[in-house]
């Protein structure tokens, strides 16, 4: 509740002020309490453990929440040494991290969670998903992370596992200046990595135009004749196109530089006759390299072996540079304790530049000791987000403490991925002795170039107002509000090949693409097999590679929060959402629709639904309470889930297509939690949860052709269920001996089970929704032999997850250390088809050490060791390694100064 409650759970005036400053909360509680009693605070000297000091505020917030939530503060994130929101959230009870970007809450995939920035909807730079990659948010800008696991009417109804609210740092209470510098080294970088020339601005995380398509090339792509031209196209024209591309992409082996980072923050609060003004400005920069050994396979079957094996297999080195920078500028104004305005501006930028040099086995092409293959690919990607958020908080004591809050935001997310390269070299041997290397001598093979662009724009605004009522032994707050957002996305992908058959044989020899496509070669008429250069290009861009999408959400909600005799708290309400979404694909290299207007209208999502929620809290005493939450929510199809065009998922590199008849999933959620907050700061919570899912959205593999990537279909299963138990605790060791109270143990364990029934049953002569969608995609009469397991666990679900942290804070306050352990149980990544078992990611044991030394009140030296065990990450199928990556141990050292 937003208004002050003189109850056993009421916060003290000091705590209210601290919480309001820390989390940018509405000032309703603090203002109402300040009206009751003003205190003069002189000097307070606090002595205590750093962990309990940092966790106390967030625990008190969790205790006073009406709904089940877990909260992680900035100091807790700093203590674990995690560099971004995604890494930090894997420490939260029941959460697992997938691909370093997306969070699975209680085993439900990323589509089952939603992300907000300061309680506002934000865009995503991912071309295939609406959910925001959480690695985009550096820990330097985060004040706290709130994961609400039970639905409340004032949050989006697109809710499955949970809602992640990233709350950024707000205006400081006093002058602040902080600077931090650091460096790190990864043991995997002891091996040399592979590099190419790139652009002059790569250190800034930006391409300077080196990788971009030239105007002459884009003009050719959109012309009536197309990339290949017509019968009148000349050799000179095709030469100009070839030479306009960046061919300075030959790789070489070099040593890797250590990572470096720095951040600066400055802020202040100024009192004046017309109110209080505040400002906080911060910038951060990080540049790091990682060299890892990778293996991957595709096309599981019996080709080339007696039992099962992969027809294609890769094994080699991946070198990746990541450059991240962020900037924030927050402005605040308080007219008085009842009226507050805050403007938050955030800029986030993340560049990834990856080179892979891998040995490539193809059962159809490789002959060991005679003809062997090597594959080189380059992937460059920039992701960024810009967000401006304005919000106001207003209290009216003269109107019985009526309050009114509002917000408005403009955000844009961009993704730019120019100059992608994929080339296969053939190594020739004579009696096992290496003789030469050339472009693969197969007529159908291409050198692939790819260029992707995405813009995602979001406008959002909302408001809520409430009125508290006080009576004999009860308190009641009524609250209404509205949330409104509009999102528009434009994305394009240009893909084409330079054919090996279009190049004369003598020019295909060499092991470096820069040498083969040197100007001296491409300007030579003999380089081309045709006198006019025809056949040199293969346009791989397809219908739907360029698309536009939009959605609009209008929502209103009503909530009542009833508090009786300081013992019972009943919070409930209903949310109504009117949701519209459309995705339109274009024909290749044109602005003409891929589908007819009737077909587009058939896949428009237009839903308006009520979503109820009820939360009951029984407060046994000042330390213990029980919660019960029941709600109904939905999970809607993503932007491309209804398109029949294949697209490449940049995370898995799989080809994915949707189902035009895809429906929203309906969820019934039940949560029960016991919480015990002890006066010493120790705490324990035990939670039971259950979810029933109607029409869960799953993926099934269709087929893979030759060496092509697997093809996946997004479809509705018939039903799904998820249930489990979560335990979360924090205790010091003072119960053993008083001298041991400076050491503590915290952690959480989640045990759960899930099931999904796809709905395949040929015997009933009635097609389920899943069967209909799969038959339409395969153009088949039966699909009973396609899927291996009609009933299985949910994709991405781990049956158990554990986090443990052992820490010590010295009595003199100079030293602090933590050992942090994280592990998850095996989880299905790709469901099995055609008799092959499901592909599972194996458990990964992560062990980190963080030590901090505080020479004085202003300084901090931080030393981290991450991934001490150095375990290999693996996805296995039928006992074979579908994907594997060797990980190193990272050592980092940083120094910060603050006053």
Language-model segment annotations:
Residues 219-356, 384-388, 612-615:
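Transmembrane beta-barrel wall of Gram-negative outer-membrane proteins
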Residues 445-454, 461-470, 475-479, 614, ...:
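Conserved C-terminal beta-signal and adjacent last beta-strands/turns
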Residues 124, 136-180, 249, 898:
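A beta-strand signature from Gram-negative outer-membrane beta-barrel systems
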Residues 47-76, 110-113, 120, 125:
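N-terminal periplasmic "start-of-domain" segments of outer-membrane beta-barrel proteins
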Residues 683, 688-692, 709-827:
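Gram-negative outer-membrane beta-barrel transporters
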Residues 91-93, 120-149, 169, 195-196, ...:
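Short acidic/polar hinge/loop motifs at secondary-structure boundaries
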Residues 454, 462-464, 513, 517, ...:
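Outer membrane beta-barrel strand-and-loop segments of large Gram-negative receptors
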Residues 334-336, 344-346, 380-391, 395, ...:
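Structural signature of Gram-negative outer-membrane beta-barrels, strongest in the C-terminal barrel
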């Amino acid at each position: 509740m937003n208004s002050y409650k003189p109850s056993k759970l009421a916060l003290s005036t000091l705590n209210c002020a601290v919480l309001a400053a820390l989390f940018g909360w509405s000032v309703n509680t603090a203002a109402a309490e300040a009206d009751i009693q003003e205190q003069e605070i002189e000097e307070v000297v606090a002595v205590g453990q750093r962990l309990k000091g940092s966790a106390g505020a967030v625990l008190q917030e969790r205790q006073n929440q009406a709904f089940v939530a877990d909260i992680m503060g900035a100091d807790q994130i700093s203590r674990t040494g995690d560099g971004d929101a995604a890494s930090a959230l894997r420490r939260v009870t029941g959460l697992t991290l997938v691909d370093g970007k997306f969070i699975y809450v209680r085993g439900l995939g990323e589509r089952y969670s939603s992300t907000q920035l300061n309680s506002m909807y934000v865009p995503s730079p991912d071309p295939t998903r609406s959910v925001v990659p959480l690695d985009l948010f550096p820990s330097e800008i985060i004040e706290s992370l709130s994961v609400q696991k039970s639905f409340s009417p004032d949050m989006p109804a697109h809710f499955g596992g949970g809602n992640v609210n990233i709350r950024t740092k707000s205006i400081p209470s006093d002058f602040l200046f902080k600077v931090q510098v650091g460096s790190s080294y990864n043991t995997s970088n002891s091996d040399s990595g592979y590099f190419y020339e790139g652009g002059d601005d790569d250190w800034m995380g930006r391409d300077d135009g080196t990788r971009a398509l030239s105007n002459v090339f884009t003009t050719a792509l959109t012309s009536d004749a197309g990339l290949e031209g017509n019968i009148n196209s000349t050799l000179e024209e095709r030469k100009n196109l070839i030479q306009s591309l960046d061919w300075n992409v030959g790789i070489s082996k070099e040593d890797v530089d250590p990572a470096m980072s720095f951040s600066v923050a400055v802020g202040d609060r100024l009192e004046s006759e017309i109110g209080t003004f505040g400002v906080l400005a911060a910038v951060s920069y990080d540049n790091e390299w990682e060299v890892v050994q990778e293996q991957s396979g595709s096309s599981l079957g019996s080709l080339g072996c007696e039992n099962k094996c992969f027809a294609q297999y890769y094994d080699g080195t991946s070198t990746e540079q990541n450059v991240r920078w962020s900037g924030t500028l927050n402005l605040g104004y308080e007219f008085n304790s009842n009226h507050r305005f805050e403007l938050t501006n955030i800029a986030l930028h993340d560049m990834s530049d990856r080179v892979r040099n891998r040995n490539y086995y193809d059962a159809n092409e490789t002959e060991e000791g005679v003809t062997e293959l090597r594959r080189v690919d380059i992937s460059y990607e920039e992701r960024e987000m810009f967000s401006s958020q304005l919000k106001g908080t207003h209290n009216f004591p003269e109107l019985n403490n009526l309050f009114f809050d509002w917000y408005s935001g403009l955000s844009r997310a961009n993704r730019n991925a120019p100059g992608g390269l994929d080339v296969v070299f053939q190594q020739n041997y004579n009696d096992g002795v290496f003789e030469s290397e050339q472009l693969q001598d197969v007529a159908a093979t291409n050198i692939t170039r790819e260029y992707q662009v995405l813009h995602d724009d979001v406008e959002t605004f909302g408001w809520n107002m409430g009125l508290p009522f006080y009576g004999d032994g009860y308190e009641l707050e009524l609250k209404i509000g509205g949330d409104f957002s509009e999102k528009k996305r434009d994305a394009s992908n240009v893909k084409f090949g330079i054919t090996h058959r279009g190049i004369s044989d003598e020019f295909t020899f060499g092991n470096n693409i820069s040498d083969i496509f040197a100007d001296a070669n491409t300007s030579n008429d003999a380089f081309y097999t045709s006198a006019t250069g025809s056949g040199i290009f293969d346009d791989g861009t397809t219908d739907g590679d360029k698309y536009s999408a939009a959605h609009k959400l209008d929502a209103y909600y009503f909530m009542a929060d009833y508090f009786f005799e300081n013992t019972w708290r009943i919070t409930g309400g209903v949310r109504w959402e009117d949701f519209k979404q459309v995705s339109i694909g274009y024909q290749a290299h044109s602005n003409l629709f891929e589908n007819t207007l009737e077909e587009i209208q058939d896949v428009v999502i237009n839903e308006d639904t009520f979503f109820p929620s009820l939360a009951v809290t029984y407060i046994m005493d000042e330390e213990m309470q029980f919660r019960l939450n029941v709600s109904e929510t939905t999970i809607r199809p993503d932007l491309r889930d209804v398109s029949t065009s294949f697209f490449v998922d940049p995370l898995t590199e799989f080809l994915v297509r949707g189902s035009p008849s895809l429906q929203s999933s309906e969820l019934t959620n039940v949560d029960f939690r016991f919480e015990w907050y002890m006066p010493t700061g120790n705490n324990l919570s035990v939670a039971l949860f259950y979810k029933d899912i109607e029409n869960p959205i799953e993926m099934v593999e269709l087929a893979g052709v030759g060496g092509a990537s697997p093809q996946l279909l997004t479809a509705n299963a018939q039903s799904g269920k998820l249930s489990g138990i979560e335990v979360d605790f924090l205790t010091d060791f003072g119960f053993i001996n008083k001298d041991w109270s400076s050491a503590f143990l915290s952690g959480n364990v989640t045990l759960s089970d899930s099931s999904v029934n796809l709905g395949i049953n040929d015997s009933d002569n009635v097609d389920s929704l899943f069967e209909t969608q799969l038959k339409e995609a395969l153009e088949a009469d039966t699909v009973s032999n396609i899927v291996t397991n009609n009933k299985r666990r949910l994709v991405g679900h781990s049956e158990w997850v554990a986090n443990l942290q052992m820490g010590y804070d010295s009595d003199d306050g100079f030293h602090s250390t933590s050992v942090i352990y994280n592990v998850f149980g095996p989880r299905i990544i790709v469901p099995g088809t055609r008799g092959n078992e499901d592909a599972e990611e194996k458990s990964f044991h992560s062990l980190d050490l963080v030590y901090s030394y505080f020479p004085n009140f202003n300084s901090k030296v931080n030393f981290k060791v991450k991934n001490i065990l150095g375990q290999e990450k693996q996805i296995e199928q039928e006992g074979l390694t579908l994907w594997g990556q060797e990980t190193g141990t990272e050592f980092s050292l940083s120094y910060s100064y603050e006053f």
